[in-house]
Amino acid sequence: MKIKRVLAVILCVAAVLSATSCSVIRYGNAPEVYGFAYSTEFFGKEETLPEKYKNAAATVTMCKNEREIAYVAISDAKKELTGVKFSFGEFSDGEHIFPADKIEGYKMSYAEKFSNEKQAYYTEPFGYIPLNDFTNNSKVASAENQAYALRFETSADTPAGIYRGKAAIEYDGGKKDIEVVVKVIDIT
């Protein structure tokens, strides 16, 4: 009788532990999005993006008469993404709207290079491809990144403020939104 109870307790504990471990492991179940600003940190398409950028707002700070770039990237550790498209909407500070003709979207292209040190090939960002119907429909291999760039341009007439908007990456019938923040400073 005691053996049956002990066996029942062991089986219950094993069932709870296995169910718990299955629900805790979530890495790679869905694509992750990353937001970051122009910096010296460039990431190749095979590199793991830093956790600090995951679901972070892509934030740029700029003065008047300047151009700055915010980056948004998507990656899925488990599966290939198809039909990947990038879009963005209006940016507003609640009072003013950032001029739409002063925002441009680009898809990052990557160049393959060889490292003599590591004796291996790697990729690094190479150029910006303007988004259009042809270039804005792509495939992202599993465990690779695809970055997109939003270039903002201010003029002397652009009102200072903190402009907020959304960028979206659609894929395989799904969609991920990420906040983009543009801080325009008037130093005159």
Region roles according to the model:
Residues 25-54, 78-150:
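Surface-exposed binding patches on compact interaction domains or structured appendages
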